[in-house]
Amino acid sequence: MKKIRTGMTLAAAVALAVGMNPFGSLPGSRVCAEDGTTAAKEVTLRVCNWEEYIDLGDWDEEETIDLESGDIIGENSMVEDFEQWYYETYGVKVKVEYSTFGTNEDLYNMLTLGDVYDIVCPSEYMIMKLMAEDKLVPLSEHFFDTSDENNYYSKGVSPYIRNIFEKNEINGEAWSKYAAGYMWGLTGIVYNPEEVSEEDASSWKILDNPDYKRQVTIKDNVRDSYFAAVGALKSDLLTSESFRNDPDYKQKLVDEMNDTSPETIQAVQDYLQDVKNNAYSFETDSGKADMITGKVLANYQWSGDAVYTMDQAEEDGVFLDYAVPEESTNIYFDGWVMLKSVIGEDKDKQKAAEAFINFNSRPDNAIRNMYYIGYTSVISGGDDPRVFEYADWNYGAEDGEEDTVDYDLAYFFTEDGNSEDYVITAPAEQARRQLYAQYPDADAMDRSSIMIYFDEKQ
């Protein structure tokens, strides 16, 4: 099994944060021709993304991803490669000014205080908030034209993810009208199987389980902690056979997990006080290190960070597992949206912004980003096999390995979820470790729920 790369050089991070090109000049990036006239119109594209959430390049040669369909390596940053690709493809120079943010609330405050960006990458609930506030520009009709070879997103987004973006609405408008997915995952529990049973880790009730007093962490934000608390409080209902077998199970699950009745809010407050008395900490990022160093035995985590945690612990000889709670799990997304206040009617900017989405959705680039940051792209690749090849490259069993499991990913890669072409023969342990975190199985997906956007009245 190959390792997911994490981290970046300080120089590259600082350079991108201030809009510099950390790798020098690009061919064709000069705005003046030799005679002193303008060689081509230049578009400035201001992008704001999560910290450490895009490939910065500068890979070592031994990091080459050698797939059946060809090698992939990040020599330059994704931003640099996009600038060059855009000029070669459209004959127009684009200069990307790349910035980062730490939380969705940080991004929203930056926008409120007047920071100017054309395209940003918030999580699903912030996308819903920006939609509700009428702050976004809809994606163009051309963006969805699959006959255009450069529309990599529409051609390659996972059918499973596309369906979610088309079904979920704000004010009668689908997410897909305004947002294109980037990364996705589920929330769950990273745990030490030497100290914590799989059964205990597979329930949100582990958070206040006295057997793990001061040995478990929970997320320090209202949405994630509220979701976990509702799951724990309604555990008996959510895991009951009658509830699971209800013909309207998925909708009823969403309704239960998004219950904001006064009674439920009070019960959640009381429950979280119990969790506070039991947990090691409420945290945003420190839980990864606490698991790796053994300070805690279980950590409420986003799946991408769960992969990082398991990878890093494994380097120290500690093998951690990942569980998706039986009650329900939150399926989350980060996605690209364009801001009305900046792009407005500027078609040149919109074309560049949509091209940036498409370039990051090209299968080889989706793989580069996944390798570099450890999260899972919404891109399955369509007719391009490389994303599945990459999953197999990462997690497929070695020849002759005996203790294996057939891990079915057809739900993610196909329209109907029924194909034998998307089964990975993986080491058996991967059914509860990195593969399970990065590509949860169909059972985990079935009990996943969107957490809707709550307006100020809620």
Task: Please name every model-derived segment.
Residues 20-38:
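Sec-dependent signal peptide cleavage junction
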Residues 410-458:
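Conserved C-terminal helix/tail region of periplasmic/extracytoplasmic solute-binding proteins
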Residues 218, 225-229, 238-321:
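Ligand-binding pocket segment of bilobal, Venus flytrap-like solute-binding proteins
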Residues 35-39, 93, 97-108, 128-184, ...:
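Hinge/lid segment of periplasmic solute-binding proteins
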Residues 35-133:
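Early extracytoplasmic/lumenal segment of secretory-pathway proteins
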Residues 206-222:
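Short loop->beta-strand "edge-of-pocket" segments that line small-molecule binding or catalytic clefts
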Residues 338-426:
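Mature extracytoplasmic/periplasmic domains
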Residues 145-152, 266-273, 317-340:
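Periplasmic-binding protein-like
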